[in-house]
Amino acid sequence: MNESGQVRVVVTGHDADGKSVVAADKSVPPEATAAAGTRFHLLWGADQPPSYPDTGAESTDLVPFPAVGGIRFAESVILPDAEVDYEAESIAGLQLQPGAAPGMHTTPSVDLGVVIEGEVCMLLSGGVEVHLRPGDCFVQNGTLHGWRNHTDRPARFVVMLVGTEHRGLG
């Protein structure tokens, strides 16, 4: 991530002769519609399984959470608790859970993630907190969850989201 909070993404593709080329080299700003205390960078995505060879071109109308079978590659930065107003919910594309702790939500996806910087707590049903450190991986199977950072430094994780059917389980 650079000083402006943007993430550089290099995407490859194929030219007309089938040779590998740089299809995109871009800086991605955080999404404006992330959860309170979260900077969400949608780095890359597809709404259907990729087929090769392709140009590496990306759809310009991607939403943060994929449809069934779609994929997203993203980075999340979780700010320290002291910097966050968890009551100021602004989560787009998520199913918030009434009566649960602020920010608790489900997504119609399997989220495969790895913490790359800092420490973060994954909140689950019943107040369960799972402490994650750099190198720790998680698989979020469409379950009710939220994120907290009890330290004084931002935490970062990268995540691959795979769109799934979700029948409303909390």
Predicted regions and their residues:
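Short, conserved beta-strand element in jelly-roll/cupin
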Residues: V77-L79, H105-M122, G163
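Short acidic-glycine-tyrosine-enriched beta hairpin
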Residues: G126-G142
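Conserved short histidine dyad/triad with adjacent acidic residue
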Residues: S27-V28, S59, R72-T107, N141-L144
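Short beta-strand His + acidic residue motifs that chelate non-heme Fe in jelly-roll/DSBH
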Residues: M104, M122-L123, H145-T151
